[in-house]
Regions:
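RecA-like P-loop NTPase motor core of helicase/translocase proteins
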Residues: 1-172
Length: 172
């Protein structure tokens, strides 16, 4: 079991409280979490997500979309799977792992920004015969009554692109 340092625990609790406040807001809120390189940001976010899931009122489910640059989505998924290994509170998945074309409650969908932003290989938002694309998956998840939290890892690199803004709009 991974033990958080005192500053990590404090930051994770703070982040969880900010996200809870944002979820209660009638506006689409943005929560930014910054910490120095090597401080354990992924670990702190993992703990905050675990706290969100544990403290949700009955009947109010959460699903998550985690988007990263380069191959960081794979690294993040592996870290989170190890972190959640003992209690299995959250499930980590790639697009092709999704069942029933939706993100399950307490499931984190890991995506690479490259898949969203690169022209002609955009499998996540291109319409196809199975209606198996990111927009449909997000809508199906919302139709289940779950709130979706978008986590943009390394957002300073990509969050401003047109496709990224489109994803943010679809989720909100």
């Amino acid at each position: 079991m991974i033990e958080l340092k005192k500053y990590q625990r404090s930051a994770a609790d703070n982040l969880r409280e900010l996200v809870e406040r944002a979820l209660r807001s009638s506006e689409n809120e943005v929560v930014v979490f910054q910490a120095p390189t090597g401080s354990g940001k992924t670990l702190m976010v993992s703990e905050a997500l675990k706290g969100l899931v544990k403290q949700r009122p009955t009947g109010v489910g959460l699903s998550f979309v985690w988007v990263s640059v380069r191959m960081l989505h794979e690294q993040s998924k592996e870290k989170l799977e190890r972190y959640y290994e003992d209690d299995r509170l959250l499930q980590c998945s790639y697009f092709e792992d999704l069942e029933d074309r939706k993100i399950a409650e307490n499931e984190i969908l890991f995506i690479n920004w490259h898949s969203i932003n690169k022209k002609d290989i955009n499998i996540y938002v291109r319409e196809n015969e199975q209606d198996n694309n990111l927009n449909s998956i997000i809508q199906n998840t919302k139709d289940e009554g779950r709130q979706i939290i978008l986590i943009i890892d390394e957002s300073h690199h990509t969050a401003g692109s047109d496709k990224s803004k489109e994803l943010i709009d679809v989720i909100s």
